[in-house]
């Protein structure tokens, strides 16, 4: 369906603002839930940009963005819930305490970064293709900038999980929260499987 010029412009402005502001806020977040929420705002901006294109390729990119964020968020939230992690400091040394939950969080972070072989990369690629196809080169540039911001906040999670030691003894995977691990791992597998397809 064709979008009117005014509607397309409004969606493009809102999407651009959301992508930039969400990415900047995610970089500065000190809480895993807030980081994921801000990353979600950035993803929502990419969805709005995709819809603003008003083309079948744009709508396909929007749908892929939604699926990509759903998988990444579930992997992050489930992996964190399995070890009752909320503050970023609690991720220090998490790779040793909770290897499966850490793997889920890692895949979620890589997908948010738009790393190759993940659904996040595929979603960003589709948006870049749709933007370039419509002559919106600036939108493609904005997606690349948002991906670079994702490298900072996603990379920070991975660095804490595998390359830092915890100052305090936090819990590992276990207890009633272990139930969150299964959907997190399924989401991580989906993120990789679709990325490889």
Predicted regions and their residues:
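Cytoplasmic/organellar membrane-interface segments at the starts of transmembrane helices
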Residues: 96-103, 154-197
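Hydrophobic transmembrane alpha-helices and their helix-loop junctions in integral membrane proteins
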Residues: 1-122, 129-150, 155
